[in-house]
From Swiss-Prot:
GO terms for cellular component: cytosol. Keywords: DNA damage, DNA repair, DNA replication, Ligase, Magnesium, Manganese, Metal-binding, NAD, Zinc. InterPro entries: BRCT_dom (IPR001357), BRCT_dom_sf (IPR036420), DisA/LigA_HHH (IPR041663), DNA_ligase (IPR001679), DNA_ligase_AS (IPR018239), DNA_ligase_CS (IPR033136), DNAligase_adenylation (IPR013839), DNAligase_N (IPR013840). One of its GO terms (biological process) is DNA repair. The gene is ligA. NAD(+) binds at D32, A33, E34, Y35, D36, S81, L82, E113, R136, E173, K290, K314. Zn(2+) binds at C408, C411, C426, C432. HAMAP family: DNA_ligase_A (MF_01588). It comes from Salmonella heidelberg (strain SL476). DNA ligase that catalyzes the formation of phosphodiester linkages between 5'-phosphoryl and 3'-hydroxyl groups in double-stranded DNA using NAD as a coenzyme and as the energy source for the reaction. It is essential for DNA replication and repair of damaged DNA. Its cofactor is Mg(2+); Mn(2+). This is DNA ligase.
Length: 671
């Protein structure tokens, strides 16, 4: 066997292995970027020796064989995948190939849309009624997922409107919004269930459940982007026209679809989407560029596994492979001990990553991680980089186990793990320098007491020099004492003292949030402040009384009750008040006297708003007598859903709670 034959055989075997893990097991071992690199290498070798191309080469087909647990559906029209480009030069070369094949000097009109990172599906409607749905599978045969697809609320069971074809097969992507993904993993960590590496895996795992009742509980959604079978009817002769027709029939279509009349316009679209990517609320890994004219598409035709008239222009990879060099343990403000992987530095999504969170001991056990392992690292948007999985097939011989500490790495106190919790905590409290530092950083943060100019490095020095032990000590600092800190001149020191003085005037809600009570975020703090009105009333509340507050269940109520029951906490609060911390007396809102549809209602906001900030919306709702909560429960009266609403919207629909959109909220605010 020639060396190139051996190389081709090994590459094909490796790619088939990873295709099986990705398409069939929903458990990819390597990042997409590494798969793409291997595929490019195979294509280049086959281009050198086309006589060695085999019919079963990964370059000649679409995906992997379907699971036998599902019935199989044969695609009457094959579901092909797209070829990829990864930079401007490659896209421009693709554009030139299309122009040359069309023998045209005029610019092609391109239809550009998002490349969703989910699971491709085919849905068949007969006389407007959904009759079957299937995964892509190997492009020829997929898995019958009809029962599961019927549980996805975004997918209509019956199309509406005029001129619906007798048989219409639409194609699109089932995906999971990021908020829903985070909620699923949060629940899984709490209950010991399966934690998914990323939203794509979670969507695939949710859609390919043998029990549709499980799928129904997952907040999956869907965007339509193409057509397979078309019988007994007509569709527009442009791709954009078809998308608009699908939307008119009730099928969801992404609103980020644009016609581009030049290669430069396509590049501008690509850059704009890349810039907006962190705020979309769902994962994409590029943009899809298609010739808009169906006549030109037909003229261009197909290669073995992809159309010549479309390409996926992919973003820089959000996942890369590297090695874990060590694991260190950090202590947070509530004593939570978090393992952090120290990595061989690697570029991920344009950022050099050298650390990644490992969450807790359970996550380390789930990953099967050892120091020295080769791992896949993921960084999406502003999310802290995390280890997605271990590349077990490439584990070095010299790895060693990760040993979780039995004593706090900072203060030496015992650590404990409460039954039912995933987090291990230091028991040292404020004698622990790390907890003290993090508690004080939280106290002065922008959304808490908002002490301008008091950054993390100042807090670190204040604690290390024993100048500050509790939040009250901050208000006793003088410019003279601050001047002794590193890089702190007299003027800067006086500015910090002035900022501390200004911060004394706050709100009850901010003060509660600044105290750092476990599980009490901004929304819960605002709810407690609004419900009880005064510190005295809150301090003396029972656990049962605390649970009457929207968003407060038994766990949060217990944390709040225990916090105020602790004498040292009450002492610190007394000192803060003695130093002059104050807030306005509560304004009692009589909801009976407010003529507003929001008066007396418990309201939850979810998704992103385009007409006003979330804080403005909360303030206006509260002024009209609404109680704005942070999570959906049986106590919730109304959910306001913005763009890319996730798990909160799904839960509201599950509980039968009224849901309105942003436009309706604005209309009612002005009513």
């Amino acid at each position: 066997m020639e060396p190139i034959e051996q190389q081709l055989t090994e590459l094909r075997t490796t790619l088939r292995h990873h295709e099986y893990l990705y398409h069939v097991m929903d458990a990819p071992e390597i990042p997409d970027a590494e798969y793409d690199r291997l595929m490019r290498e195979l294509r280049e070798l086959e281009a050198q020796r086309p006589d060695l191309i085999t019919p079963d080469s990964p370059t000649q087909r679409v995906g992997a064989a379907p699971l036998t647990a599902f019935n199989q559906i044969r695609h009457e029209v094959p579901m092909l995948s797209l070829d990829n480009v990864f930079d401007e030069e490659s896209f421009l070369a693709f554009n030139k190939r299309v122009q040359d094949r069309l023998k045209s000097t005029e610019n092609v009109i391109w239809c550009c849309e998002l490349k969703l990172d989910g699971l491709a599906v085919s849905i068949l409607y007969e006389n407007g009624v959904l009759v079957s749905a299937a995964t892509r599978g190997d492009g020829t045969t997929g898995e019958d997922i009809t029962s599961n697809v019927r549980t996805i609320r975004a997918i209509p069971l019956k199309l509406h409107g005029d001129n619906i074809p007798a048989r219409l097969e639409v194609r699109g992507e089932v995906f999971l919004p990021q908020a829903g993904f985070e909620k699923i993993n949060e629940d899984a960590r709490r209950t010991g269930g399966k934690v998914f590496a990323n939203p794509r895996n979670a969507a695939a795992g949710s859609l390919r459940q043998l029990d549709p009742r499980i799928t129904a509980k997952r907040p999956l959604t869907f965007f339509c982007y193409g057509v397979g079978i078309l019988e007994g009817g007509e569709l527009p002769d442009t791709h954009l026209g078809r998308l608009l027709q699908f939307k008119a029939w009730g099928l969801p279509v992404s609103d980020r679809v644009t016609l581009c009349d030049s290669p430069q316009a396509v590049l501008d679209f690509y850059r704009n989407v890349e810039k907006d990517r962190p705020t979309l609320g769902f994962d994409i890994d590029g943009v899809v560029i298609k010739v808009n004219s169906l006549a030109l598409q037909e003229q261009l035709g197909f290669v073995a596994r992809a159309p010549r008239w479309a390409v996926a222009f992919k973003f820089p990879a959000q996942e890369q492979m590297t090695f874990v060099r060590d694991v260190e343990f950090q202590v947070g403000r509530t004593g939570a001990i978090t393992p952090v992987a120290r990595l061989e530095p690697v570029q991920v999504a344009g950022v050099l990553v050298s650390n990644a969170t490992l969450h807790n001991a359970d996550e380390i056990e789930r990953l099967g991680l050892r120091i020295g392992d080769k791992v896949v690292i993921r960084r999406a948007g502003d999310v802290i980089p995390q280890v997605v999985n271990v590349v077990l097939s490439e584990r070095p011989e010299e790895t060693r186990p990760i040993v979780f500490p039995t004593h706090c790495p900072v203060c030496g106190s015992d650590v404990e793990r409460v039954e039912g919790e995933a987090v291990t905590r230091c028991t040292g409290g404020l004698i622990c320098g790390a907890q003290r530092k993090e508690s004080l950083k939280h106290f002065v943060s922008r959304r808490a007491m908002d002490v301008d100019g008091m950054g993390d490095k100042i807090i670190d020095q204040l604690v290390e020099r024993e100048y500050v032990h509790t939040p009250a000590d901050l208000f006793r600092l003088t410019a003279g004492k601050l001047t002794g800190l590193d890089r702190m001149g007299p003027k800067s020191a006086q500015n910090v003292v002035n900022a501390l003085e200004k911060a004394k005037a706050t709100t009850f809600a901010r003060f509660l949030y600044a105290l750092g009570i476990r599980e009490v975020g901004e929304a819960t703090a605002a709810g407690l402040a609004a419900y009880f009105g005064t510190l005295e009333a809150l301090q003396t509340a029972t656990i049962d009384e605390l649970q009457k507050v929207p968003d407060v269940g038994i766990v949060v109520a217990t944390h709040v009750f225990n916090f105020f029951a602790e004498e040292s906490n009450r002492d610190v609060i007394g000192q803060l008040l003695a130093e002059g911390v104050h807030w306005p007396a509560p304004v009692v809102i009589n909801v009976q006297e407010i003529d507003s549809p929001f008066a007396g209602k418990t309201v939850v906001l979810t998704g992103s708003l385009s007409q006003m900030s979330r804080d403005d919306a909360k303030a206006r709702l509260a002024a009209l007598g609404a109680k704005v909560a942070g999570s959906v429960s049986k106590k919730t009266d109304l959910v306001i859903a913005g763009e890319a609403a996730g798990s909160k919207l799904a839960k509201a629909q599950e509980l039968g709670i009224t849901v309105i959109d942003e436009a309706e909220m604005i209309r009612l605010l002005g009513a």
